[in-house]
From Swiss-Prot:
Identification of the protein by name: Protein YIPF4
Record gene name: Yipf4
Superkingdom field: Eukaryota
Residue intervals on the Cytoplasmic side: 1-115, 162-168, 219-225
Lineage: Eukaryota, Metazoa, Chordata, Craniata, Vertebrata
Assembly information from the UniProt record: Interacts with YIPF3 and YIPF5.
Similarity comment: family membership: Belongs to the YIP1 family.
Biological function: Involved in the maintenance of the Golgi structure.
Subcellular location: Golgi apparatus, cis-Golgi network membrane
BP GO annotations: endoplasmic reticulum to Golgi vesicle-mediated transport
GO CC aspect terms: endoplasmic reticulum; Golgi apparatus; plasma membrane
Length: 246
């Protein structure tokens, strides 16, 4: 039996390391070229200056100047919402006043139970504008009569035992000026016909007074209704006199 011979020489495969002797490695030389890679970290001179200023302020105890407050959604409301102006609600109340018949199906009590300020004010101002006739003082008179006339109706209603707030009376009286605004352009056309003009004026006053009284005079007044309806009727006669100049 022959003894085993020396192991075969290792032949490296492609991709394996090849070890060479130190004597052969003395003549090996080379270099590795580094790729030209530029990194844009977004650092500019302005950023450095800002960082320096930020550090300076914080060191001096003025870091609170750099704090950014979180935006409150309440601050981004539309202007109409900020002023509590609901155009759809105002339009619905206008329809309730102009069409006071219960058969039309409008929830007319919303004019009284959900009062607002901007709608009646707009109606009163519009009535004042068409009542000018070159007399600017009429505007202040109409607004004054609206405020103090509503106060008189409110006090009378409370004396008679009605559960109504001044804001409700102010809103109802203001909205109920709309019938007088409707008849205003008609009076311009038929002004030369005295009889027709008088009938239209009476119709407008009755229309306005009925709209206001039907909203303000509740079942709690019972037999005392005429005591409140009569001053409301007189109030709208006075409003009409400011318009016509009578």
């Amino acid at each position: 039996m022959q003894p085993p011979g020396p192991p075969p020489a290792y032949a490296p495969a492609n991709g394996d390391f090849t070890f060479v002797s130190s004597a052969d490695a003395e003549d090996l030389s080379g270099s590795i070229a580094a790729p030209d890679v530029k990194l844009n970290l977004g650092v500019s001179g302005d950023f450095i200056k800002e960082s320096t200023a930020t550090t300076f302020l914080r060191q001096r105890g003025y870091g609170w100047l750099l704090e950014v407050e979180d935006e409150d959604p309440e601050d981004n409301k539309p202007l109409l919402e900020e002023l509590d102006i609901d155009l759809k609600d105002i339009y619905y109340k206008i329809r309730c006043v102009l069409m006071p018949m219960p058969s039309l199906g409008f929830n007319r009590q919303v004019v009284r139970d959900n009062p607002d300020f901007w709608g009646p004010l707009a109606v009163v101002l519009f009535f004042s504008m068409i009542s000018l006739y070159g007399q600017f003082r009429v505007v202040s008179w109409i607004i004054t009569i609206w405020i103090f006339g509503s106060l008189t109706i409110f006090l009378l209603a409370r004396v008679l035992g009605g559960e109504v707030a001044y804001g409700q009376v102010l809103g109802v009286i203001g909205y109920s000026l709309l019938p007088l605004i409707v008849i205003a352009p008609i009076l311009l056309v038929v002004g030369s016909f005295e009889m027709v003009s008088t009938l239209i004026k009476l119709f407008g006053v009755f229309w306005a007074a009925y709209s206001a009284a039907s909203l303000l005079v509740g079942e709690e007044f019972k037999t005392k209704k005429p005591l409140l309806i009569y001053p409301i009727f007189l109030l709208y006669i006075y409003f009409l006199s400011l318009y016509t100049g009578v």
